[in-house]
């Protein structure tokens, strides 16, 4: 698993201390190797061990999350409606303590993504995509792809506490460590957040009763497992039993997205329509991955569904399944530059990525589209450092192969 990124905020209360204003660099330095000898880092380590020591006897520290608008592209409709999403930043000391007791499990989930069905860590340009497509074909060739409306707002804390029981069973390292995890788990299911307006800004703390904080290290994994549990419960409600789920269904979930390879023998009972009805019983609005008003069939072939905004297409040249990103997402990637100070480097990198992603949509029209984009960037002098001519379709395929091998 990756180390803690040093270029992000260290959270509350560090943000209120000027000497700690340089994000996590204030603790770990900016050199290639982390600096653990600074006074700030030594104090941080002492705080981490105090958190663990108190959790051992059932004492919960006040770990406060700080909410801020997520810096991302949103559709015009969502932007006009003010539907900006929030990031909830976690305190650094808590993140370290949590990783000490949960990181091995998190790594195991990522390393077994398609095998377990929880696809955190999946590489759409690697063999994972073919594994999913082949499993759909093996099950009979029909599948369901779904999503939820306001998934985060309808979470069931009981499912998350049941997940903790499974995690402790996975570790099997004694009641003391299990108890520490149960105290640290409170910040996931009942997180505390900084609030207040006007003269009271930053002076109030309130606690969530449902939903998971987006900046928590385990939020994506926990949401994925809730998604999976709900799909199993719906199978029980529609088919009449639960124990055959893994025989007849191969689920793939990531957060609130899912794709289900369903055996033909249960397809009339467990499909898009019946899952939607069953989900309503648990307080969830389940839709297709398209999220629009478009009506989709109860089940579809793998070539007609999407997962994580990517489709499934068999590439004859590579003799493997590839994951074409939605065309509009491929084009929109060229519209924005996130950091004006690194504009030239970012535009070159974005163009390379565009070439790779566009190649997944086939040869037809590739040369015209890539040449058009290339000419615009050249006219802006963005690609002065790139002296090679516009790359042919075969280059996009070769770039894709290299990304697959590097993973």
What does each of the following model-derived ranges do?
Residues 1-407:
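Viral RNA-dependent RNA polymerase
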